[in-house]
Design a protein with these regions (language model features):
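Core catalytic region of metal-dependent phosphoesterases/phosphodiesterases
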Residues: 6, 11-100
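A structural motif corresponding to the C-terminal end of an alpha-helix
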Residues: 58-68, 101-122, 201
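Active-site-proximal loop/helix segment associated with metal-binding centers of metalloenzymes
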Residues: 93-101, 115-195
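Beta-strand-turn-beta hairpins that frame and shape the catalytic cleft
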Residues: 1-4, 119-125, 216-218
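Conserved beta-sheet core of the metallophosphoesterase superfamily
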Residues: 186-250
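Active-site environment of divalent metal-dependent phosphoester hydrolases
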Residues: 10-14, 39-42, 75-82, 132-134, ...
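Acidic, low-complexity terminal tails and accessory targeting/binding regions
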Residues: 253-254
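Active-site neighborhood of phospho(di)ester-bond hydrolases with catalytic His/Asp-centered motifs
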Residues: 6-7, 31-35, 70-74, 126-127, ...
Length: 254
């Protein structure tokens, strides 16, 4: 089984056909999208709606070719929650780049896509930002490090069942991202992961922009599509492949 990990898209529709071609070129069986599908520096309400309509069509086409697992990032959660709920109100206040005028349509489209908080193949854990030991002990139980990775994944995904539960990882923000709490798998910064990442697991994450796919602290960092506010790229657009032979970086343009 060949699994391709794709970093934060941030409403860049031009990336989608390039990712499809890379997946085809690499004979990909499964694709994991590492979250932050939504929002970008200068995207408008209408621009985000148009992007998400394009993304939805692209997702359906890709899901017809291979298994596709879309994960939620911190930028996606406000659109995932229903407008008018107390959970939505709490999350919206913490959402950088949120486009309220796009919420209704994007929320509607998201209901037809099976988003998750975490994914595992039984050996590795993929989340948007990474699982730290402190957050795991606090939110999953003091004995969570004794759990199989599938159970850790299941407990994280159960947070999607109730809006109030999803608020928990969305409001657990560490100092590196402007909070004062224990960083969650939606918010953990690369520096925070270096200090307390759960390294008894092999993790794959996005969230922190990197110049190229990086391996450090037994984790793979894959946010290579993000840009500066003027649109200049931070990363090289590389992707991560997991094959029977292990992990390796894949160029976006082959």
């Amino acid at each position: 089984m060949r699994t391709l990990f794709v970093g934060d898209l941030h409403a860049k529709a031009d990336l989608l056909p390039l990712i499809s071609r890379a997946a085809q070129r690499e004979n990909t069986d499964r694709m994991v999208l590492l979250g932050d599908v939504c929002d970008d520096w200068n995207v408008s309400n209408n621009g985000l709606i148009r992007f998400f309509e394009t993304f939805t069509s692209w997702y359906r086409r890709e899901a017809g070719e291979r298994e596709v697992i879309p994960l939620l990032g911190n930028h996606d959660v406000p659109y995932f929650l229903k407008q008018g709920s107390s959970s939505y109100a709490r999350v919206r206040a913490l959402a950088p780049g949120f486009k309220p005028g796009a919420h209704r349509k994007v929320h509607e489209l998201m209901q037809n896509i099976p988003f998750q908080l975490a994914w595992s193949d039984g050996n590795i854990l993929a989340t948007h930002a990474g699982l730290t030991r402190a957050w795991g002990r606090r939110r999953l139980g003091t004995d969570y490090m004794d759990m199989p990775v599938e159970e850790v994944t299941d407990r994280l995904n159960r947070m999607l069942l109730h809006p109030a539960s999803l608020v928990v990882p969305m409001t657990d923000i560490g100092p590196a991202r402007g909070g004062a709490g224990t960083p969650s798998p939606l918010w953990c910064d690369r520096g925070e992961f270096a200090e307390d990442g759960d390294m008894h697991l092999t993790q794959v994450v996005g969230h922190t922009p990197v110049p190229t796919v990086l391996h450090e602290h037994d984790a793979w960092f894959c946010d290579t599509f993000s840009t500066m506010s003027d649109g200049s790229p931070i990363g090289d657009g590389s992707l991560l492949m997991l094959s029977e032979g292990g992990f390796y970086s894949v160029p976006l343009l082959g």
